[in-house]
């Protein structure tokens, strides 16, 4: 469906940016982009009534939805053009480092590097996208939720993701907690939620970090 196509392109793009931030080789960056494009291809085997259900999935529907990563893997694993690393990244993109993910429930040491990056990108894009069953979160709220998932997401992938994000571009206008509007004049590495701003009314400089 249209959402899955857009989501896959978004996840591929975000994953490649994170991979570059981590210093991966050009070939690894390309491969993780392929992972992003293919990670949800198995959803073509899930009924649209489940994919776009406006309410909460029941247990049987959720069990079927959880099969999509296995379906994706099975659709590409015998294709010569896709490396084992790409196939494993697709299979494991819903695994969590504490073993609470699926389809295999493996923990950090058994999750491939591509999947660790894909997981962060997949969750972020899902959070900021409106779906029939939920509203979209703001980028800031989504980043804060990502930052809270230290027991589930790989720390290195998470840090690289955060370092590559620019939530408040220079010259953008924000509203401060005191109600004053301010212009962003500088972003601070590692503190993406707290830029340096100048109040439009007061002229005061606020270092929100």
Task: Identify the role of each PLM range.
Residues 1-209:
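Histidine- and acidic-residue-rich, metal-dependent catalytic cores
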């Amino acid at each position: 469906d249209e959402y899955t196509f857009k989501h896959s392109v978004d996840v591929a793009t975000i994953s490649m940016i994170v991979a570059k931030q981590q210093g991966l080789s050009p070939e690894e960056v390309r491969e993780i982009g392929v992972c992003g494009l293919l990670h949800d291809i198995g959803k073509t085997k899930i009924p649209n009534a489940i994919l776009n259900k406006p309410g909460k999935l029941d247990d049987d529907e959720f069990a079927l939805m959880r099969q999509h990563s296995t379906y994706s893997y099975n659709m590409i694993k015998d294709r010569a053009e896709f490396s084992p690393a790409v196939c494993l990244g697709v299979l494991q993109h819903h695994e969590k480092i504490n073993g609470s993910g699926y389809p295999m429930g493996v923990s950090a040491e058994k999750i491939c590097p591509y999947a660790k990056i894909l997981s962060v990108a997949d969750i972020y894009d899902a959070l900021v996208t409106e779906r029939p069953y939920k509203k979209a979160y703001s980028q800031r709220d989504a980043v804060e939720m990502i930052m809270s998932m230290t027991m589930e997401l790989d720390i290195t992938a998470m840090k690289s993701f955060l370092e590559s994000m620019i939530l408040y571009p220079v010259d953008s206008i924000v509203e401060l907690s005191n109600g004053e509007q301010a212009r962003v004049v500088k972003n601070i590495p590692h503190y993406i939620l707290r830029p340096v701003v100048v109040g439009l009314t007061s002229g005061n400089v606020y270092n929100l970090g």
